[in-house]
Amino acid sequence: MQVQLSESKNPLAYLLLIAPFFLWGTAMVAMKGIIPHTTPLFMAGVRLIPAGVLILMVAGFMGKPVPKSWLAWLWIIIFALVDGTLFQGFLAEGLVRTNAGLGSVMIDSQPLAVALLSFWLFQEHIGLWGWLGLGFGIIGISLIGLPQEWIFNLFDSGITIYTDNWQQLFNNGEWLMLLAALSMAVGTVMIRFVCQYADPVMATGWHMIIGGLPLWGISSVLESQQW
């Protein structure tokens, strides 16, 4: 059943439009609260695999076709590693090193990367106001994520970057959140190629399962006391 939200006057339709943003924000808070009781990579796998199984069950009930060609599975595997393993791995590790609110803001840099990738790959234009918004967004994300010393030095005496600054940048949670956002952006663009060979619902379910398995594998080697 197709719902025309733009033509509906039902208040529930507008709630459905903002629901993903609300659920996304609460997910960050929930993950931050769970991390002290488990390990980040194990938790990331738990986020993916059960949800993937549920999606496959729904897809089977809906009669969605199972991917059959090797190209379909190749794209699903690549999609899984980028949008599943890398995204959820960076996200979980980043939340260990930053708070949920700041982490959510850093993840919101993902639309900026999607716009740039779409312009490069598909020649999709967002117009003058879109690029202006992207510029303000990049400035805001930079002010949030870059070390304060870099920003102060830029206004005082130009950019002077030391080794300690690089170590601080690569070790803090904000940088990991940016890597998570970039992984999610690449995955968002990749779904267009995935859908050429596989049903999007089936591909989503399988990519969550396949993407979660490496997280559990890495967790079993590098982490302890997951339970």
Predicted stretch roles:
Residues 42-53, 82, 91-130, 134, ...:
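Specific alpha-helical transmembrane segments that line the substrate/conduction pathway
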